[in-house]
Amino acid sequence: MFTSHFSASAVTAAAILSTFANGLPTSLVSKVKRGDSLKFNFGSEKIRGVNTGGWFVLEPWITPSIFEATPSNVVDEYTFCQTLGKTEAESRLQQHWSTWITESDFAEMASIGLNFVRIPIGYWSVSPLPGDPYVQGAYEYLGEALNWAQSNNLMVMIDLHGAPGSQNGFDNSGRRGPIDWTQGNTIAQTHTALNKIRDDYASHPAVAAIELVNEPLGPDLDMDTVRQFYMDGWGDLEDSHVAITFHDAFEGVNSWNDWGSGMWALMEDTHHYEVFDSGSLQMSLSEHISTACSFGASMATNNKWTVAGEWTGAMTDCAQWLNGRGVGARYDGTYNYNGESSSYIGSCDGKYSGTVAGLSQADHNNIKSFINAQMQAFEDAAGWIFWCWKNEAAPEWHFQNLTAAGMVPQPLSSANGCSS
C-alpha cells in the first residue's frame, strides 16, 4: 500500500491516447495468443478482489497489537525481527501467520462474489539474504493459501511486496527509511526471488498473475533501471502462463502505453488512494467520487490490461499508524515525519481506532457511496483489488466488515456510483 511520505496528488493528468470498448484491448490480442493458457480471462472478465495485507508482510497499522508489544523503535518487519531476535520473532510470527487469515476467510471471500486475491509477500520469505534479521516460514503458508484459493474457485496474484534494499522506503516494503533497491546486487537478488516463485508456484492452478515488485517509488529511482528490471522480469516469466504484472511506479497510470511492445500477457497495476496529501483530504464527497470516476476512465484508455490493485473506502488518513508508527495523520494535523507536518482538516474520532459499527451514520453513507463509485470506475478497465481484506482497528479499510455492514454493493457487479 502506498502509505506515506511521497506526497503526490491523487489526480493523475490522463492523456487520452486511444479509445476502445470494454474488454480485451485490440493491441493485446495477438500478444496473448503466445501465452494462450492464461488461467483468467483478463479484460473480458472483471477482477474483483481483495489484498491479504498484513499477513506475510507486517504493517503496524493493520495489526497494531503486534507492534504495541514491542519498543517504539520497532516500525516495520525488519526492526521487529532485529529487536526481538529470530527465536522470539519466529514464535510470534508463526502464531500470526497461522491465525490471521485461514481457509474460512477464503471461503467467505468467495461467498460474497470475489474472484481474486492478491497476496503480498517479501523477498526474505522467498529467498533470504545473509545477514538479514528476518525470519522465514511465510512462504510455506503461501503454498497452503494457494490450495485454499483453488478449493474456493479464487484466482491469486502473488505480489512481491518487499524487495532487497527497499524499493520505496515504506514500512510495507519490510524496511522503512532509505531506498536502496537498484543498488549493488539488489536487482539480481529480486530476480532470484521472482524465479523461485515462478518455479514453485506459477504452475499452480490458482496462480493467475505474478507481480514483479510492489510500488517502486519511481520519482526516487532511475526509471531506466526500473523499466529494464520489468523487461527482464517479463522475460523470466513469459512462458509461465500467468499475467505478468508491473506497478506503474507512480509515473502516472497512462505513462506506460509506449512501453512493452512485443511483450504479451502484461498487466499494469495502479494504486488509487485519495488520502495521502492535504489536497485530497480536503475534498468533498462529490469531489472524491468525481476523482475516482475520472481515474477509472483514464485506466480504461490504456493499451494494456490495467487493474486498480489497491484502493480503499477511506477518505482520511486517520487510521492509527497508517503513515507509519509514531507519525500521526495529516487529517487531524498530527502528522510529523522527516520535517514534514500538516494542518488540521478534521477530527479523527472513530477512525483512528475503531470498528465499522462505530462509524457515524454520515461516515457510513459516505464510505458506501465512495466504494460504490470506485468499483464501477475500475471496472471500466480490468477491475479492482481492495486494500485490504481485514485489519484490527481501521474501519475504512476493512472489506470483510464493510461488506457485512452493507457498505459494499451486492452483487458486486451492481456497482453504479459513477452513473449519476
Positions of PLM-derived features:
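Active-site-adjacent substrate/metal-binding segments within catalytic domains
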Residues: 54, 58-136, 384
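An active-site-proximal structural segment forming one wall of the substrate-binding cleft
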Residues: 90-117, 131-162, 173-209, 229, ...
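Aromatic-rich peripheral "rim/lid" segments of glycoside hydrolase catalytic domains that contact
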Residues: 344-420
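N-terminal module-boundary/linker segments of secreted carbohydrate-active enzymes
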Residues: 21-59
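Hydrophobic faces of well-ordered beta-strands that scaffold small-molecule active sites
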Residues: 48-52, 117-119, 156-160, 208-210, ...
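Extracellular glycoside hydrolase catalytic/binding regions
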Residues: 206-207, 213-372
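Aromatic- and acidic-residue-enriched segments that line the glycan-binding/catalytic groove
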Residues: 60-75, 133-137, 165-182, 322-333, ...
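Fungal secretory targeting signals
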Residues: 1-31
